[in-house]
């Protein structure tokens, strides 16, 4: 394995639940990163089996919050963590954790979707440029699920920053 992805909203569990701690301990032992899905999800659409069993489709998930991620990082300060979707609507909280912890990264997956849902709306270009300015390209990577490389190519970034985002950060983190 090169890493794991945690989608707490699908399982309805809190990422800082004590039962999850053995997962993070194993990731530390194996020296592999944990990619946390970040973003609000309608329980009905994110978990079809729950909706089929009568779950309220208008109830939003309250698991996988920045506060839970902070608890995990405080408990395991050396755990390699990636925040998917650059933290989505929790961007600034996740950015703060990535600034504080040397081993926290962000990916660029689905930024167009999450950026268009921000108030005020933010373009992918603006979002990536902001993150590079305040976090550094060494901690940002191309997202593996629905990201278009031309979005990064269009940013006002140096060749080194673009190289980091389009592969070098990932190569370093996953030891490829």
Locate predicted features.
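Active-site micro-motifs of SAM-dependent methyltransferase domains
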Residues: 11, 88, 113, 148, ...
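Catalytic pocket-lining loop regions of alpha/beta-barrel enzymes
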Residues: 2-3, 8, 16-141
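Mid-to-C-terminal alpha-helical segments outside catalytic/metal-binding sites
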Residues: 130, 134-141, 146-176
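A generic structural motif
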Residues: 10-11, 108-113, 163-169
């Amino acid at each position: 394995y090169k890493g794991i992805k945690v989608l707490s909203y699908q399982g309805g569990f809190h990422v800082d639940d004590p039962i999850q701690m053995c997962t993070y301990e194993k990731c530390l032992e194996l020296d592999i990163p944990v990619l946390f899905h970040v973003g609000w999800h309608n329980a009905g659409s994110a978990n079809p089996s729950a909706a089929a069993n009568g779950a309220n489709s208008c109830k939003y998930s309250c698991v996988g919050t920045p506060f839970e991620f902070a608890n995990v990082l405080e408990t395991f300060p050396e755990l390699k963590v990636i925040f998917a979707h650059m933290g989505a609507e929790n961007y600034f909280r996740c950015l703060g954790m990535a600034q504080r912890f040397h081993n926290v990264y962000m990916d660029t997956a689905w930024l167009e979707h999450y950026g268009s849902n921000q108030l005020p709306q933010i373009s992918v270009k603006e979002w990536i440029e902001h993150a590079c300015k305040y976090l550094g390209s060494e901690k940002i990577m191309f997202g593996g699920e629905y990201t278009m490389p031309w979005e990064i190519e269009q940013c006002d970034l140096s060749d080194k920053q673009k190289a980091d985002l389009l592969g070098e950060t990932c190569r370093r983190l996953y030891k490829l």
